[in-house]
């Protein structure tokens, strides 16, 4: 079993959802970002999504756009992001780590080279937000052939006819974007989330993670009662933006992660 399968199976036995945390690689700088990454599992993160900085993150809201700018201004590259995963893996062989971003940097890096290096450094899966199923041959199929999970996004506008196409070839988990729009947007109603999870379960046995708009332990707990995973990104990244310095940013992100984890773990 993959690390993602193992983690979700373990949490299912514990009757709780996973806390899935998103941070951008290299934000606010390489050293602080690595410190955050290494600290997330102990703070309560069950799965980590690590953003690959890109100059045009069109699916992301202001918080993550600014995180991309901070990271790129600090010299973060795809090669440095892969190196960061390598350094993380030297001390953690159990926490699933997924790279999330856009196809352009991967294409420029070289798809074969990227897949080989991602697998070698210990990446478990990929979320590539601008690559629809019609382009599975470009990255999804080669990545899965190498043993990487390929996680698809579904949204409130993904209809029942489209869902099987989106889910075909998905692995690891399904990421349901509970608000149509950019990351960090307003949260969806719990009734809407419950209906969406029920609809997705009719189409897939994969774990379902819910993201976009989750900012507090209370909200995380409410979503954790309905889904297999609770994805939080913008709220964590806001802590970096608002911190007085990088050392404070590390503390603040890990503190919020701890609060969210407590909410998720006490939800059921």
Curated annotation (Swiss-Prot):
Protein function: The alpha subunit is responsible for the aldol cleavage of indoleglycerol phosphate to indole and glyceraldehyde 3-phosphate.
Family: Belongs to the TrpA family.
Species of origin: Pseudomonas aeruginosa (strain UCBPP-PA14)
Assigned keywords, A-Z: Amino-acid biosynthesis, Aromatic amino acid biosynthesis, Lyase, Tryptophan biosynthesis
UniProt name for this protein: Tryptophan synthase alpha chain
Pathway: Amino-acid biosynthesis; L-tryptophan biosynthesis; L-tryptophan from chorismate: step 5/5
Active site: 49 (proton acceptor), 60 (proton acceptor)
Entry keyword annotation includes Amino-acid biosynthesis: yes
EC number: 4.2.1.20
């Amino acid at each position: 079993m993959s690390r993602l399968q193992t983690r979700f199976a373990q949490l299912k036995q514990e009757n709780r959802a996973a806390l899935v945390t998103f941070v951008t690689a290299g934000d606010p700088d390489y050293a602080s970002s690595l410190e955050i990454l290494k600290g997330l599992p102990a703070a309560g993160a069950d799965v980590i999504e690590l953003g690959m900085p890109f100059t045009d993150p069109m699916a992301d809201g202001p918080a993550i756009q600014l995180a991309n700018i901070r990271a790129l201004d600090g010299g973060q590259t795809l090669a440095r992001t892969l190196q960061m995963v390598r350094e993380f893996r030297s001390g953690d062989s159990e926490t699933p780590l997924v790279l999330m971003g856009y196809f352009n940097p991967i294409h420029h890096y070289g798809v074969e080279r990227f897949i080989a290096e991602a697998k070698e450094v210990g990446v478990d899966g990929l979320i590539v937000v601008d690559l629809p199923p019609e382009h599975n041959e470009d990255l999804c199929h080669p990545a899965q052939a190498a043993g990487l999970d390929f996680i698809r996004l579904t949204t409130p506008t993904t209809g029942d006819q489209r869902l099987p196409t989106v889910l075909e070839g998905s692995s690891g988990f399904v990421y349901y974007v509970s608000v149509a729009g950019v990351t960090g947007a307003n949260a969806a109603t719990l009734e809407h989330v419950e209906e969406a999870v029920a609809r997705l379960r009719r189409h897939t046995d994969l774990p379902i993670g819910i993201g976009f708009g989750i900012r507090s332990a209370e909200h995380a707990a409410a979503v954790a009662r309905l889904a297999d995973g609770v994805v939080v990104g913008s709220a964590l990244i806001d802590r970096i933006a608002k911190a007085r310095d990088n050392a404070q940013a590390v503390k603040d992100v890990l503190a919020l992660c701890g609060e969210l984890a407590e909410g998720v773990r006490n939800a059921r």
